[in-house]
A protein has these predicted regions:
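C-terminal hydrophobic helical "lid"/dimerization subdomain
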Residues: 1-3, 251-255, 298-345
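Glycine-rich beta-strand-centered segment in the early N-terminal region that forms part
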Residues: 20-35, 48-93, 112, 132-139
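Adenosine-nucleotide cofactor-binding segment
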Residues: 173, 188-252
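N-terminal Rossmann-fold NAD(P) dinucleotide-binding loop
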Residues: 180-181
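Glycine-rich phosphate-binding loop and adjacent beta-alpha segment
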Residues: 192, 196, 247-310, 344-345
């Protein structure tokens, strides 16, 4: 089978590898239908973070269950499923509290190679999300939106939920990648009255407005702080969705949040140090982390996509076949695509 493989920064290739098989009774083998490139993949693609040469890539997909282990009872062969990057069990205290991204029973579970023809998905019971029908029952737009439920839409929703966005709030969304844009959708779903999206790129600004943003802020740093405080009559935001992960973005978030606000942080941290003084002096809460993908998909997001209440699949602005995986990464690296869709045959 074919699978996307990392060679070195800036170089992705397709390699042949044996088709995966059931190794544990909790496994499922998935035939991938659609996958994609994540903004987090660019950290190692650009050489900013380390990754072993020859490792398989991808952590977002939808597909068809090919085979299941004897202890997998929630899905069966032939089911159409969302394949999350998380592996919740649905039974531990973390999962029951709604934080399946931190499942205590499956802490070591992590699969890669979703950008391939087949995937062995470990700890499959409960974690996989069954989609009614088959891929042929849906148009391309809906399939793309279903694909976002494996990561970016659920992660954007996690940012808004942990930031405790509620009816009438003023929300700032930091980051105009797919997660940030999905955060705009999530803030609107949760009732935000004003959504300020931080973006310097026209195509992303337009999509943010389509998704429900009311204001666009192009500035960064101190200028961004001044602009947002001016927009909020010096009050600051009720909630901030931090979807970047840099030290500057977290610092900016603490400055634009009003006293008592909550920051929902889903940007992968790129610096081990963080100044928490502003959090204390302003009574600001900092939450967020690994998204509760299965929890949010099953409780709200799958229904929202199937009933066309949201259309997060619009974040896919370029489409590629699996053999063109290098081009898919290049398009995102050069910002020619907001998010690259990968069609797997």
């Amino acid at each position: 089978m074919k699978v996307a493989t990392f060679i070195e920064p800036g170089k992705m290739v397709i390699t042949d590898t044996p088709k995966p098989v059931i190794e544990q009774e909790t496994d499922a083998v998935i035939k991938i239908v659609r996958a994609c490139v994540c903004g987090s993949d660019l950290w190692w693609y650009r050489g900013i973070s380390k990754r072993e040469s020859g490792s398989f890539a991808g952590h977002e997909a939808i597909g068809i269950v090919e085979e299941v282990g004897t202890k997998v009872t929630d899905v069966s062969k032939g089911d159409f499923v969302i394949v999350p990057f998380t592996h919740g069990c649905g039974q531990c205290p973390s999962c029951k509290a709604g934080f399946d991204g931190n499942c205590t029973n499956h802490q070591a579970a992590k699969n890669v190679g979703y950008q391939g023809q087949y995937l062995r998905y470990t700890n499959a019971n409960w974690a996989l999300v069954k989609i009614p029908g088959q891929p042929s029952d849906y148009d391309n737009e809906t399939l793309n939106s279903l694909l976002t439920l494996s990561d970016v839409m659920a992660t954007g929703y996690h940012a808004a939920a942990t930031a405790e966005v509620k009816e009438g709030d003023t929300v700032v969304v930091m980051g105009d990648g797919a997660v940030g844009l999905c955060g705009v959708i999530a803030a609107k779903m949760l009732g935000a009255n004003r959504i300020i999206a931080m973006s310097r790129h026209k195509d992303r600004q337009e999509l943010a407005l389509t998704f429900g943003a009311t204001d666009i802020v192009e500035e960064r740093g101190d200028e961004a702080v001044k602009r947002i405080l001016d927009l909020t009559n010096q009050a600051g935001a009720d909630a901030v969705l931090e979807c970047v992960g840099t030290e500057q973005s977290v610092d900016t978030a603490t400055q634009i949040a009003r006293p008592g606000a909550v920051i929902g942080r889903v940007g992968i941290p790129q610096n081990p140090d963080m100044n928490t003084n502003n959090l204390f002096w302003k009574n600001i809460g900092l939450r967020g982390g690994i998204a509760s993908v299965t929890t949010f998909d099953k409780s709200v997001l799958l229904d929202a996509v199937l009933t066309h209440k949201i259309n997060p699949g619009l974040v896919f602005t370029k489409s590629f076949v699996l053999d063109d995986i290098q081009k898919a990464y290049e398009a995102m690296d050069k910002r020619d695509a907001i998010k690259s869709l990968v069609i797997v045959d």
